[in-house]
Amino acid sequence: MSAKQPNRKPTGKRKESDASALDGRERKRAAKRKGLKAGSRQQAEQSSKNNNGKQAKDPRIGSRKPVALIVDEKGAKPVAPKPAKEKKLVMTPEQELAAIENDDRLNDLLDRLDAGETLEATEQAWVDQRVDRYQELMDELGIIDNDDDEEDDGSFDDASYEAPTQPASEEELWDRFTQVDYQPEPKPEPKKK
């Protein structure tokens, strides 16, 4: 009988042919790469656009203005700065007064104040600024606003009216107006006969 040879366990890797090894390496490289091939995208664009052999000149390259290679003191002219133009719209005082009187935002905020609402600090500051400017324009133009002092319906008799003993100054009236608990000064009733 012949002696039985012991079973061999495979040692190492299985041998592959050159073609299968090359295919495996290519698949491994392709799996590692995630993006496009390396290269310049401008080259790819140029090759796709310019197939007719005629190359278009890039307008960014070069300059049309000649450059002096020698510094010449005569040729150097100081460039005068251009005067800055005022783009601010200048309004006459009459136009500005009309604009303030027709300002919807100001009218809405004044209506809210008359209704007893309290405004935010920024809104109140804006209203104060506009009212102050309105007063300045009225003084500048010499316009006196008498709409609040007299009634136009004619039911008011001057002879029966008694003036208050001491009229309130503008500062006192303004202080009362700016207070939260402002109460208007009561008007005296005309005397009955």
Curated annotation (Swiss-Prot):
Taxonomically, the superkingdom here is: Bacteria
Molecular function terms in GO for this entry? Answer: GTPase activator activity
Q: Which residue intervals make up region (Disordered)?
A: 1-91, 143-193
Q: Where is the composition biased (Polar residues)?
A: 40-54
Give GO terms for biological process. Answer: ribosome biogenesis
Keywords, sorted A to Z: GTPase activation, Ribosome biogenesis
UniProt xrefs under Pfam families: YihI
- The Acidic residues compositionally biased stretches are 145-160
For bias type Basic and acidic residues, the affected ranges are: 13-26, 184-193
- Composition bias (Basic residues) maps to 1-12, 27-36
Q: Which NCBIfam families does this chain map to?
A: PRK05244.1-1 (NF003560)
Name the family the entry cites. Answer: Belongs to the YihI family.
Function according to Swiss-Prot or TrEMBL = A GTPase-activating protein (GAP) that modifies Der/EngA GTPase function. May play a role in ribosome biogenesis.
Quaternary structure, from the entry = Interacts with Der.
Q: What is this protein called?
A: Der GTPase-activating protein YihI
The source organism is Aeromonas salmonicida (strain A449)
